[in-house]
Amino acid sequence: MALSAQEKDAIVKEHQTSETDTGSPEVQIALLTANINKLQGHFADHKQDHHSRRGLIRMVNQRRKLLDYLKGKDVNRYAALIQKLGLRR
């Protein structure tokens, strides 16, 4: 269910702000979004998996906090990321 190393590398390369950037809010939000999207497919098949659902809710909350942080720091970066990831807001 977790992202493979190749998938993570591709996401990091797409959203990083510099060559060595792996922890900026944009990268973290993109990784969380990919994990959330992957888990949603899991729940289509396993509706009663409440333990994993708890992890999903935790990821969604963490992404929400990071989005709020980014919005407070730089609205332009926030808007660009929302549009790039296709998140509704």
UniProtKB/Swiss-Prot annotation:
Quaternary state and interactors: Part of the 30S ribosomal subunit. Forms a bridge to the 50S subunit in the 70S ribosome, contacting the 23S rRNA.
Family from the record: Belongs to the universal ribosomal protein uS15 family.
Top-level division of the source organism's lineage: Bacteria
NCBIfam families: S15_bact (TIGR00952)
Described function: One of the primary rRNA binding proteins, it binds directly to 16S rRNA where it helps nucleate assembly of the platform of the 30S subunit by binding and bridging several RNA helices of the 16S rRNA.
SUPFAM superfamilies cross-referenced by the UniProt entry: S15/NS1 RNA-binding domain
GO biological process: translation
Organism of origin: Teredinibacter turnerae (strain ATCC 39867 / T7901)
Compositional bias (Basic and acidic residues): 1-18
SMART domains to which the protein is assigned, alphabetical: Ribosomal_S15
Entry annotated with the keyword Cell inner membrane: no
InterPro entries hit by this protein: Ribosomal_uS15, Ribosomal_uS15_bac-type, uS15_NS1_RNA-bd_sf
Annotated Pfam families: Ribosomal_S15
GO CC terms in record: cytosolic small ribosomal subunit
Protein name, per record: Small ribosomal subunit protein uS15
Region (Disordered): 1-25
Tagged with keyword Iron-sulfur: no
Encoding gene (name): rpsO
